[in-house]
Amino acid sequence: MSNLKHCSNCKHNGLITESNHEFCIFCQSIFQLSNKVSKKSNFHVSNKLIHLRNVLRRLLSNQCSSDVIVELKSVMTKNNISSTDIDANFVSSFLKANEKINKKDYKLVFEIINHIKEEKLNLDTSKINEVIEIFKHLVFFCQENTPSKTINYSFFLDKIFSLTSVTNNLKPQTVKNYTKNNSNQLVWENFLDYMKKKKINTSVYDYGHEYVFVDYGFTTCSLEV
């Protein structure tokens, strides 16, 4: 991401050029290249990058109540369930059955799995930069090559985490629609083929922990998967 430019609104080097406009991944401003008039927008690419930051922040912090972890471990002990058998489907079912959540929250599920498996995520500064870089390319790829602009975060982040050796344990929750599961897998395989042919920048922008934890006044995003 060596082509990031200076944003006149938030004063960060966060402008990405796309077709006839530029958008800032930090403050969400969009600049028309013709007249440079900025405006606030829910531009889906920048929104997805903001949401990714929220996910990384969640995984690097402890927001889940310890009581939930203790209760889940008690259920595992009672039913002789190993931590290696714990996946997103199991955790999600536990949360819903015990009325811990009233909507799907894969970030919470990810965090709980991380606690149960007692795994320290390999998310140092270089890994954060790598994950964000791949995710950015994935967003643009989906925008240009898929009919829907929505992204199954739990599915694709699991793939990216595995690819970058962050973790192999955060398995996504499968959905009942097998066609959708197969579609996500096909998108991922096509994306990998696309990236193999694409000339990648040798210079990766340094996001790091400061980017993940800085507060720009955005509200926490919780999307249903």
Curated annotation (Swiss-Prot):
One of its GO terms (biological process) is regulation of viral transcription. InterPro entries: Poxvirus_VLTF3, VLTF-3_Zn_ribbon. A zinc finger (unnamed) spans 7-27. Coiled coil: none annotated. Keywords: Activator, Late protein, Metal-binding, Transcription, Transcription regulation, Zinc, Zinc-finger. The keyword Cytoplasm does not apply. Pfam families: A2L_zn_ribbon (PF08792), Pox_VLTF3 (PF04947). One of its GO terms (molecular function) is zinc ion binding. Interacts with the late transcription elongation factor H5/VLTF-4. Interacts with the late transcription factors VLTF-1. Acts with RNA polymerase to initiate transcription from late gene promoters. Belongs to the nucleo-cytoplasmic large DNA viruses (NCLDVs) VLTF-3 family. This is Viral late gene transcription factor 3. It comes from Fowlpox virus (strain NVSL). The lineage of its organism: Viruses, Varidnaviria, Bamfordvirae, Nucleocytoviricota, Pokkesviricetes.
